[in-house]
Curated annotation (Swiss-Prot):
It comes from the Bacteria. It catalyses: L-aspartate 4-semialdehyde + pyruvate = (2S,4S)-4-hydroxy-2,3,4,5-tetrahydrodipicolinate + H2O + H(+). It is found in: Cytoplasm. Catalyzes the condensation of (S)-aspartate-beta-semialdehyde [(S)-ASA] and pyruvate to 4-hydroxy-tetrahydrodipicolinate (HTPA). CDD domains: DHDPS (cd00950). One of its GO terms (biological process) is diaminopimelate biosynthetic process. This is 4-hydroxy-tetrahydrodipicolinate synthase. One of its GO terms (molecular function) is 4-hydroxy-tetrahydrodipicolinate synthase activity.
Amino acid sequence: MKNILQGAMTALITPFKNGKLDEETFEKLIKRQIKNGIDVVVPVGTTGESATLTHNEHKICIEIAVNACKDTNVKVLAGAGSNATHEAIDFAKFAQSHGADGILSVAPYYNKPTQEGLYQHYKAIAESIDIPVLLYNVPGRVGVDILPSTVFRLFKECKNIFGIKEATGSIDRCVDLLAHEPNLVVISGEDAINYPILSNGGKGVISVTANLLPDYICELTHLALDEEYTKAKAINDKLYNINKILFCESNPIPIKAAMYIAGLIGNLEYRLPLCEPSSENFKKIEQTMKNYEIKGF
């Protein structure tokens, strides 16, 4: 299966207005990403607060993303994860039937399945659809690690599982995956290590920072993929401070604050249990942003 889901990808935030999904702003944010050269948009992932969306809201976000990207070269990698396999399959089937180019499926959270359980979970999802599936490994959030042996097994046996978004924070893990399976598509899931992963064989990034600075992330990613490593590293170094401050509290708390400060969202709203950043961190975010040129709509 030819992989078209790589390069510079944005883990989209989900804007709210008076407690409800702000569909108009969400569409505008996606069109801003398209305008600034992003390759793939990723709605309803961790950054999109998928855990606190209703199933209907989740599906609406996918529809908006697909419609916004229609007649463009930008692809949609739809979040379709759940800790219940039957729910993940429902999201996956919806994404496929509504035109998504692939799905991002986070490891089941809270119930801590075994490696065999993870294998069966992902195999069932992959067999339920025909579009590409990107595994999503983020043990710090979900409580379970998709071990390399399980990744290789799934990659070998499921034709539409093409790679993994690695958010372990470990460059060594990514290098090990690629050393044992060079055809596996490894995507960086942490902005702090985008450059090291790209320069060691990674094929793209799913970036939180790209919500705010899509042009920077596009340039960094494309330069690295073209093996222009000196230029890519210079951009990566410039992004160091913003990448750091955007994770001063749990994602997506800081990035939504930054988007609000930049005037890209009109309301600073979260779904509980997420809440606004501390006043101290809000000021730090605001101060750090002054060092970057942030493009509007």
